[in-house]
Amino acid sequence: MKFTIERSHLIKPLQQVSGALGGRPTLPILGNLLLKVEDNVLSMTATDLEVELVSKVTLEGDFEAGSITVPSRKFLDICRGLPDDSIITFVLEGDRVQVRSGRSRFSLATLPANDFPNIEDWQSEVEVSLTQSDLRTLIEKTQFS
């Protein structure tokens, strides 16, 4: 697996997905983020087994398909610490991911992607559409619970 992406395209979706992870995970894999590259799309998935968040970013340029998990907190901290206009390259080498940007180099331990829990998609026969204001009102009325 290999891909290159601008920090500005990565940081916001990465922060949103990392929000699914709580404090201390019960299983080591739950502290990781699933990175999957296929068809010039990077998908990032995080879960705590109750909630799963997925964010997708279109990749420009060369990439190699694949999937792996990386420590979410360390990965986010590395990306946050890089300058806004950075170009970040990720290369899977054995059981480690090399994160490179300019003269900076980081190496992160990985866990296999097939160890990452898969919350299955489900389809409902019932569909509900709400406006943003209606949803907000409903949440505010039940927020005390």
UniProtKB/Swiss-Prot annotation:
> PANTHER family in the record, alphabetically?
BETA SLIDING CLAMP (PTHR30478:SF0), DNA POLYMERASE III SUBUNIT BETA (PTHR30478)
Where in or outside the cell it occurs: the entry states:
Cytoplasm
Task: Return the GO cellular component terms, semicolon-separated.
Answer: cytoplasm; DNA polymerase III complex
Record organism: Vibrio harveyi (Beneckea harveyi)
Q: Which family does it belong to?
A: Belongs to the beta sliding clamp family.
What's the protein name?
Beta sliding clamp
Name the domain of life: Bacteria
**Species classification:** Bacteria, Pseudomonadati, Pseudomonadota, Gammaproteobacteria, Vibrionales
Enumerate the GO terms in the molecular function aspect. Answer: 3'-5' exonuclease activity; DNA binding; DNA-directed DNA polymerase activity
Biological function: Confers DNA tethering and processivity to DNA polymerases and other proteins. Acts as a clamp, forming a ring around DNA (a reaction catalyzed by the clamp-loading complex) which diffuses in an ATP-independent manner freely and bidirectionally along dsDNA. Initially characterized for its ability to contact the catalytic subunit of DNA polymerase III (Pol III), a complex, multichain enzyme responsible for most of the replicative synthesis in bacteria; Pol III exhibits 3'-5' exonuclease proofreading activity.
Q: Which GO terms describe its biological process?
A: DNA strand elongation involved in DNA replication
Q: Which Pfam families match?
A: DNA_pol3_beta (PF00712)
Q: Which gene encodes it?
A: dnaN
Q: How does it assemble?
A: Forms a ring-shaped head-to-tail homodimer around DNA which binds and tethers DNA polymerases and other proteins to the DNA. The DNA replisome complex has a single clamp-loading complex (3 tau and 1 each of delta, delta', psi and chi subunits) which binds 3 Pol III cores (1 core on the leading strand and 2 on the lagging strand) each with a beta sliding clamp dimer. Additional proteins in the replisome are other copies of gamma, psi and chi, Ssb, DNA helicase and RNA primase.
Keywords, ordered alphabetically? Cytoplasm, DNA replication, DNA-binding, DNA-directed DNA polymerase, Nucleotidyltransferase, Transferase
